[in-house]
Design a protein with these regions (language model features):
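Beta-strand-rich ligand- or partner-binding modules
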Residues: 1-104
Length: 104
């Protein structure tokens, strides 16, 4: 639970995402004071702030990827789900340096 409610958040990670792969970022928030079971809140797909730069398989370059959601209802609980997928089992996406920032 957040100490201060927020209506904005940013997700950033360094990604190594081959051409055959993709990373999907989902989030869900709970409004301030909500008594709704958090597990019953639906996940929302977040779009990256700009096109994700993909790398050639075997390239160890990591590139920063940002997601921002603004103008949300005030929330004090947030969950993030990252789905990494690929059509080639030898070209899998990798992420590191994950940061999730909720701003008051």
């Amino acid at each position: 639970k957040l100490e201060n409610p927020s209506n904005f958040f940013r997700i950033r990670y360094a990604g190594n995402i081959p051409q055959e792969a993709d990373v999907l970022v989902y989030y869900k928030t709970s409004p301030v004071g909500s008594t709704l079971d958090f597990d019953r809140i639906n996940w929302t797909l977040s779009d990256p702030d700009y096109a994700i730069v993909k790398v050639q398989n075997g390239d160890d370059t990591f590139i920063d990827v940002d997601y921002s959601e603004e103008g949300l209802s005030q929330f004090d609980v947030i969950a993030v789900k990252i789905v990494m997928q690929s059509t080639n089992s030898s070209a899998i996406p990798r992420i590191r340096d994950l940061r999730i920032i909720a701003c008051a």
